[in-house]
């Protein structure tokens, strides 16, 4: 096995406050720990993930790891971080990884680039840690709170996780420290330093913050709120031809020797777009909001349906990023009306024309559209919503 990850999540997180440990606080609908896990589960270079937890957190932990296939059975942590890491390493020994990354459970924003740099840093090194330059001035302060001097920060670095190690060497160092009753080492690089190994460094990232206090959690919530929740919905609709002298497509009346049968004006294009927008919102479908059993929608113009769906997006503080519509029929010919359809959809939705795409195709005379029995449409809608922050 090439690379394992050991995530330390056994702490109680008392400084963060709240009813649950900090690693189980929810950010954007997911726990901090799950967000941390996902960063590594999505990395192809990671084979397995071992999480060290507190026994009292079992129900919370099961929610955090639900559906994640790389995660091994949890291991109970010890009284200190050093003991917890040792327990996780002993459990991983059965899998024989060549490399191991040790990560804080409350560090949910680790960029993929940092993970890649951690793994690569072990090419030629036994231990490597992500660091950042110290930008604040550092002062020595005595017990009375008085400044006694200024530290030269040129050679100082702030240390993050994931810290990267050759697995066998890290396990041996932890065992040796335990045998020597050395129990005050605050990170795994310190354990390796104590054991006589050289620890290399690589670039960390300012976004790779550890959440320790209630203020950290609030800051993380604000950071997530600034990120858009991008969603895509799809829609599909079909209407058969019936008596008439025109068809409504995308809000445009196109002269034809037949019409389209439907409870409303049977605008197959606008119906598909409406369902696509509602689908992106997870807000039902056109039939749920405008049931054909309701006589008030008999003969209704379908621009009302699409405008309603667009307004639902805006009520939630979102925007429509793009609408894409494909009309499927042998006749009438859509090409001569394409620009008018795009313009009408843009008008209904109050969107720039560049955010609306309209295409047409045939089924090469196959199926009901090929037999000129009706028209089909499929659509997609991309929307951006503010990310909802969970409790």
Swiss-Prot record:
Disulfide bonds: none annotated. It catalyses: 2-C-methyl-D-erythritol 4-phosphate + CTP + H(+) = 4-CDP-2-C-methyl-D-erythritol + diphosphate; 4-CDP-2-C-methyl-D-erythritol 2-phosphate = 2-C-methyl-D-erythritol 2,4-cyclic diphosphate + CMP. Pathway: Isoprenoid biosynthesis; isopentenyl diphosphate biosynthesis via DXP pathway; isopentenyl diphosphate from 1-deoxy-D-xylulose 5-phosphate: step 2/6; Isoprenoid biosynthesis; isopentenyl diphosphate biosynthesis via DXP pathway; isopentenyl diphosphate from 1-deoxy-D-xylulose 5-phosphate: step 4/6. The record marks 153, 210 as: Positions MEP for the nucleophilic attack. GO terms for biological process: isopentenyl diphosphate biosynthetic process, methylerythritol 4-phosphate pathway; terpenoid biosynthetic process. Keywords: Isoprene biosynthesis, Lyase, Metal-binding, Multifunctional enzyme, Nucleotidyltransferase, Transferase. Residues 231-391 are annotated as: 2-C-methyl-D-erythritol 2,4-cyclodiphosphate synthase. The record marks 15, 22, 263, 362 as: Transition state stabilizer. A divalent metal cation binds at residues 237, 239, 271. The keyword Nucleotidyltransferase applies. GO terms for molecular function: 2-C-methyl-D-erythritol 2,4-cyclodiphosphate synthase activity; 2-C-methyl-D-erythritol 4-phosphate cytidylyltransferase activity; metal ion binding. The keyword Lyase applies. Residues 1-230 are annotated as: 2-C-methyl-D-erythritol 4-phosphate cytidylyltransferase. It comes from the Bacteria. Its EC number is 2.7.7.60, 4.6.1.12. 4-CDP-2-C-methyl-D-erythritol 2-phosphate binds at residues 237-239, 263-264, 285-287, 361-364, 368, 371. Pfam families: IspD, YgbB. Its cofactor is a divalent metal cation. Coiled coil: none annotated. Bifunctional enzyme that catalyzes the formation of 4-diphosphocytidyl-2-C-methyl-D-erythritol from CTP and 2-C-methyl-D-erythritol 4-phosphate (MEP) (IspD), and catalyzes the conversion of 4-diphosphocytidyl-2-C-methyl-D-erythritol 2-phosphate (CDP-ME2P) to 2-C-methyl-D-erythritol 2,4-cyclodiphosphate (ME-CPP) with a corresponding release of cytidine 5-monophosphate (CMP) (IspF). In the N-terminal section; belongs to the IspD/TarI cytidylyltransferase family. IspD subfamily. PANTHER family: 2-C-METHYL-D-ERYTHRITOL 2,4-CYCLODIPHOSPHATE SYNTHASE, CHLOROPLASTIC. This is Bifunctional enzyme IspD/IspF. The gene is ispDF.
């Amino acid at each position: 096995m090439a690379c394992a990850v050991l995530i330390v999540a056994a702490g109680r997180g008392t400084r963060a406050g709240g009813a649950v440990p900090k690693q189980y606080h929810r950010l954007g609908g997911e726990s901090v720990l799950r967000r941390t896990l996902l960063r590594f589960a999505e990395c192809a270079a990671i084979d397995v993930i071992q999480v060290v937890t507190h026994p009292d957190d079992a129900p919370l932990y099961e929610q955090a790891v639900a559906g994640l296939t790389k995660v091994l059975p949890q291991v109970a942590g010890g009284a200190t971080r050093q003991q917890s890491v040792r327990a996780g390493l002993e459990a991983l020994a059965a899998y024989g990884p060549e490399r191991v990354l040790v990560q804080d459970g409350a560090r949910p924003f680790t960029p993929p680039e940092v993970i890649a740099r951690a793994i690569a840093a072990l090419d030629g090194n036994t231990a490597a840690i992500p660091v950042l330059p110290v930008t604040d001035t550092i002062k020595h302060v005595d017990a009375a709170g008085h400044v006694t001097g200024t530290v030269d920060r040129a050679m100082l670095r702030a240390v993050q996780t994931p810290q990267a190690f050759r697995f066998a060497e890290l396990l041996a160092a932890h065992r040796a420290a335990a045998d020597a009753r050395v129990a005050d080492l605050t990170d795994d690089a310190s354990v390796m330093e104590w054991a006589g190994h050289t620890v290399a460094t690589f670039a960390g990232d300012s976004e790779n913050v550890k959440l320790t206090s209630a203020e950290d959690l609030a800051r993380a919530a604000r950071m997530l709120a600034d990120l858009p929740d991008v969603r895509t919905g799809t829609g599909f609709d079909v209407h058969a031809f019936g008596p008439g002298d025109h068809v409504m497509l995308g809000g445009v009346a196109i002269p034809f020797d037949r019409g389209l049968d439907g409870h409303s004006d049977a605008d197959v294009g606008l119906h598909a777009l409406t369902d696509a927008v509602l689908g992106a919102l997870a807000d039902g479908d056109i039939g749920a909001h405008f049931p054909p059993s309701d006589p008030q929608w008999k003969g209704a113009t379908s621009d009302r349906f699409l405008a309603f769906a667009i307004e639902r997006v805006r009520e939630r503080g979102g925007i429509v990023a793009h609408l894409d519509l494909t009309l499927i029929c042998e006749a009438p010919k859509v090409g001569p009306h394409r620009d008018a359809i795009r313009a009408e959809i843009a008008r209904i939705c109050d969107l720039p024309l560049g955010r609306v795409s309209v295409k047409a195709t045939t089924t090469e005379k196959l199926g009901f559209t090929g037999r000129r029995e009706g028209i089909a449409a499929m659509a997609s809608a991309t929307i951006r919503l503010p990310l909802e922050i969970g409790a």
